[in-house]
């Protein structure tokens, strides 16, 4: 009624639909992505159960550990044959060494090696005791992404897709496991060299 007095002549249903869409858009904007200052945060995930074959037709099933610093977008990836907790710890230590530091917080998907009870809208996350102790020893705060909120881990999900796209052409092209590991290591270097070049060009 107030806006009618101010001269609005449109239908109420149109206005209601507009307000509804505006509210939805504002809600989406609130969870678009996680952005932080330098040294604050990183994201971790796995590219799970990739399958490739060497020149002789032998099958290799493996995982790619994914680590991305939020601000600089520096990345660390490495091939693993399993996703056990000890493997995760080793990958994290290697990532800290590669990036020359430990961020204040690291965002994780709700993987079993990290959480005993996932974070939900109504319940707080319960971290695995061994993992939580590791985080304290390494001096970072673990943060669990809420399920079905892909915006909070967009960097690692984009990286996972990119890694698969870059590795897939080598299917049936490499000789053995050693060369496969080297392919992933070379890609890790290439990812960061590419990122540095893009930043330099933008400046």
Could you describe each region identified by the protein language model?
Residues 108-109, 121-122, 142-164, 176, ...:
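RNase H-like two-metal-ion nuclease catalytic core shared by retroviral integrases
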Residues 19-75, 83-90:
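Mobile-element integrase/transposase regions
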Residues 77-105, 124:
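Active-site beta-loop-alpha junctions of metal-dependent nucleic acid enzymes
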Residues 1-8:
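DNA-recognition alpha helix
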């Amino acid at each position: 009624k107030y806006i009618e007095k101010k001269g609005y002549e449109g239908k109420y249903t149109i206005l209601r639909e507009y307000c509804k869409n505006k509210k939805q858009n504002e809600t989406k904007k609130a969870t678009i992505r996680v952005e932080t200052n330098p040294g604050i945060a990183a994201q971790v995930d796995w590219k799970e159960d990739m399958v490739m074959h060497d020149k002789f037709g032998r099958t290799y099933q493996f995982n790619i550990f994914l680590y991305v610093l939020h601000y600089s977008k520096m990345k660390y990836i490495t091939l693993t044959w399993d996703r056990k907790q000890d493997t995760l710890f080793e990958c994290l230590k290697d990532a800290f060494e590669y990036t020359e530091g430990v961020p204040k917080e690291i965002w994780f998907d709700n993987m079993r090696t990290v959480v005993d009870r996932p974070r939900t809208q109504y319940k707080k996350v319960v971290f695995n005791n061994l993992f939580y102790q590791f985080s304290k020893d390494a001096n970072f705060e673990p943060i669990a992404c809420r399920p079905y909120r892909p915006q909070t881990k967009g960097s690692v999900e984009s990286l996972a897709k990119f890694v698969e796209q870059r590795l897939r052409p080598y299917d049936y092209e490499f000789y053995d496991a050693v060369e496969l590991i080297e392919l992933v290591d070379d890609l890790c270097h290439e990812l960061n060299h590419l990122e540095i070049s893009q930043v330099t060009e933008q400046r």
